[in-house]
Amino acid sequence: MDQFLRKNPPTNELANNQQTLLEAETLLLIVDVQQKLISNIIDNQLLIFNIKKLIDTCNLLNVRIAISEQNPLKLGMTLESILEKNEYPKFEKMEFSCSENKNFLNYINKHNFKNIIVCGIESHICILQTSIDLLKKGLNILIPRDAIGSRNEIDNDTAFLRLILSGAVASTTESLICELCKTSN
């Protein structure tokens, strides 16, 4: 990956595409963390742990949270351990990209989000297609590397690289939590 980035450095235009994360302008989007999908995901317990940390932080700071579910009749609902009796806007979809779902697009337009933290599964399918579509709409997309996953490491790594080269902001769960909190108080 280092060799690739040396040959293909991000442009200044992409590097300047970063905004301060303000609570009212930021959405945490949890993509397809469903019963029948999660068991085959590499390091799935760490992924769930990190998503739950993001949820806890967003709940504490009143950052909105939304959930997508890919074909829930076939793949099951979002993991109960993710929801923990909380109710979040949920968008059921058959499309891989959340951006193809009119209800989701209406939701992000209604709240005028500028920043979307995208986490969940699978990196090379729904995370990738959703994020690229949202980037095309001018949104700032942040990808916590340790809160996305796929069944295969090569798919996960390649999707993450493609996302960054497409203009998404690379991050980690802890980094995003600290950026949202802005202080140790």
Give the location of each predicted region.
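Bulky hydrophobic/aromatic packing residues
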Residues: 33, 53-57, 179-180
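N-terminal nucleotide-binding beta1-loop-alpha1 segment
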Residues: 27-33
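A short alpha/beta connector and helix-capping loop motif
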Residues: 24-26, 41-67, 72
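Active-site-adjacent betaalpha module
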Residues: 2-27, 60-63, 73-185
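Short acidic, Gly/Ser-rich segments with clustered Asp/Glu that frequently serve as metal-coordination loops
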Residues: 35-40
